C-alpha cells in the first residue's frame, strides 16, 4: 500500500512539473505575441488579426474535441490578439 501511495505521489509530482512547463510555454508565447503586436503598425495588426480569425474559422476540429474546448481556444486567441497583455 505504501508503494502504491509513493508511486501515485511521484506521478502527481511529474504531472505538476509538466503543468508548470506548459504554463511557462504559454506565458512565453503571450509575451512574444504581445511584443510583436506592439511593434506592428495598426493596419498590419488588423491584417494579422483578420488572417488568424480566418484560419480559425476554416479549421474543422476533430470530432473527439468537445465544442467547449474549441470555443475556449477561439476566445483565448481573440482575447490575446485584440487585447494583448499590458
UniProtKB/Swiss-Prot annotation:
TM spans (from-to): none
InterPro entries, per database record: SigmaS_Anti-adapt_IraP
Keyword presence, Phosphoprotein: no
Compartments where located: Cytoplasm
Location, primary (coarse class): cytoplasm
Alphabetical GO biological process terms: cellular response to starvation
Source organism superkingdom: Bacteria
Coiled-coil region(s): 1-36
Gene Ontology CC: cytoplasm
Swiss-Prot/TrEMBL keywords: Coiled coil, Cytoplasm, Stress response
Family in the record: Belongs to the IraP family.
Complex and partners: Interacts with RssB.
Physiological role: Inhibits RpoS proteolysis by regulating RssB activity, thereby increasing the stability of the sigma stress factor RpoS especially during phosphate starvation, but also in stationary phase and during nitrogen starvation. Its effect on RpoS stability is due to its interaction with RssB, which probably blocks the interaction of RssB with RpoS, and the consequent delivery of the RssB-RpoS complex to the ClpXP protein degradation pathway.
Protein name, per record: Anti-adapter protein IraP
Organism: Shigella boydii serotype 18 (strain CDC 3083-94 / BS512)
